[in-house]
Amino acid sequence: MGMVSRTATTAALAAALILGGAPHAGARDGGAGAAGAGAGVAYSDTTGVGVHNAYEKSAYPYFTDALDSGAAMLELDVWTNVFGRSWRVSHSNPLGNDNNCVNAANADGLRTGPRDQDLGGCLASVRAWHDAHPGHRPVVLKIELKDGFQGKAGRGPAALDALLTARLGDALFRPADLVGGHPDLDAAVRAGGWPARDAMAGKFVVEIIPGTVEKDNPLDTLWTDREYAQHLRGLAAAGRLREASAFPAVLGAAAGDPRTRYADAGLRPWFVVFDGDASFYAGGGSVDTAWYARNGYLVVMTDAHKVAPAIDGVNPTEAQARERVALLAARHASVVSSDWRSLTSVLSSVVPRGGAGR
């Protein structure tokens, strides 16, 4: 179990077994599934389980199957370059769509019609599923912009907001919903700004991160995270923050406050979501993960299966997966991410963050 204390891990594991011992009633029907965590518990005081690249056909036949899994987070990869049309959803095809989305108009179409739709089609299916499952658990939709925004091609931050709003509308939990009367996101969460889980029922939180191609492009000097944070700051200054639909994440685990990487200190308060390698967060003293929980920041811990001792990334035993979730909950994960798509009893579990809440 690495350097995580046995006491903390045991406490979190016990909580996991109590709260997530079997699939909750909403694992297949989309119910909120948060009752075990306590109706009044803040969203930021719980740990859920997410699925990496849930849009791939090898993961689920249809994206609605991913939504039905009970997972707390589902990931989409999106391409924006000028050599293709629209916002493409694919892992490795930068020019077209390769995914399990069907552009459903309603619940009857969630498993019919052609797949390989663009982001708008994926979001249409999300909305159709949402309408068929009122009060469903809160779900993070993690969008990796593989090659970043392309504002000159009509695929910049404002265009993404418009698309998300057109497709998901009132199903979105927006930055403005969190900010309230505070000056920025950081001030809001430090004041206890995340609502209770039951108040988040029926909502989607959109997280956006820089993509692998973008990060490797020496000509791209304005990555997704910084570009969207600038967008948020500008909207807030203009009194139009309500138009924003997503939360930019600081990508990459690091000791201290990772936001210090942004030379423009005025951008830092617009980041309250952090996303990085689970092994680094679980490594012990180099990262004070309790700092994130104390301040109400969300932390997505990726590649959970690679934390020592490594377990299977797709088909571990249920006991192995539950123990891993408990270990990372003890390290203050908000979302534990891997490819455990068939373990619906684990995906639908909600445990106290830190083992016993913040």
Regions found by a protein language model. Give the residues of each.
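Secretory targeting and sorting signals
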Residues: M1-R28
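Catalytic cores of phosphodiester-bond hydrolases, prominently lipid phosphodiesterases
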Residues: G33-R358
